[in-house]
């Protein structure tokens, strides 16, 4: 027999939408588990760390509105916030509302199928866990999978390659390199 974890709701992704859903689903009394493929919260703001990354939406419009206290304690430093500031904000939200306790980091949902007999979703994760849930929320976002265009010779290129969706957290030194 396979052990199955069971939650009222499962959220896939811990970016801006996923964090919001974890908070709201908890607020209405549901047990929640979120699965995030990355090692931290933030979604696109976790993965896209390239130089100059910033939001094209004004900071006050890019803030959660479910908590007046949160809005009072967080002060954006720029009208159009940078990636590091947005990532700090989302980490602050995750800590402020203790959202991490319901997130399995470094875990993908590999399969989701609806079982009509049980009236539940049955999921398989990349950690070989089986999970059952009544409500399944996909919060993976439009930028969750990187797109690599077909470029002749890319597979034989011996130099370093960087994609904006997966830029190294420690940055890249281009000094004395031909780019």
Q: Across the structure, where does each feature detected by a protein language model lie?
A:
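Short amphipathic alpha-helical segments
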Residues: 22-24, 46-47, 148-152
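Nucleotide donor/acceptor-binding cores
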Residues: 7, 30, 134, 176-179
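Glycine-rich active-site loop/strand segments that organize a redox cofactor
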Residues: 46-89
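N-terminal Rossmann-like FAD-binding beta1-loop-alpha1 element of flavoenzymes
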Residues: 6-34
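Short, flexible hinge/linker loops that cap or flank conserved catalytic cores
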Residues: 2-4, 130, 173
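Glycine-rich dinucleotide-binding loop and its adjacent helix/turn
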Residues: 69-76, 82, 86, 140-179
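Glycine-rich FAD pyrophosphate-binding loop
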Residues: 26-50
């Amino acid at each position: 027999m396979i052990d199955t974890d069971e939650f009222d709701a499962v959220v896939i992704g811990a970016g801006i939408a996923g964090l919001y859903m974890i908070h709201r689903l908890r607020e209405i009394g549901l047990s929640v588990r979120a699965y995030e493929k990355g090692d931290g919260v933030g979604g696109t703001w976790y993965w896209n760390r390239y130089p100059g990354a910033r939001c094209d939406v004004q900071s006050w419009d890019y803030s959660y509105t479910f908590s007046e206290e949160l809005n009072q304690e967080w002060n954006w430093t720029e009208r159009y916030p940078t990636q590091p500031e947005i990532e700090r904000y989302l980490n602050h939200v995750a800590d402020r509302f203790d959202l991490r306790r319901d997130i399995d980091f470094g875990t993908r949902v590999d399969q989701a199928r609806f079982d009509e007999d049980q009236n539940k979703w049955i999921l398989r994760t990349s950690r070989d866990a089986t999970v059952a849930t009544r409500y399944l929320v996909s919060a993976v976002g439009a930028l969750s999978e990187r797109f690599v265009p077909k470029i002749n010779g890319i597979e034989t290129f011996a130099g370093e390659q960087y994609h904006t969706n997966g830029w190294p957290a420690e940055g890249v030194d281009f000094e004395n390199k031909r780019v």
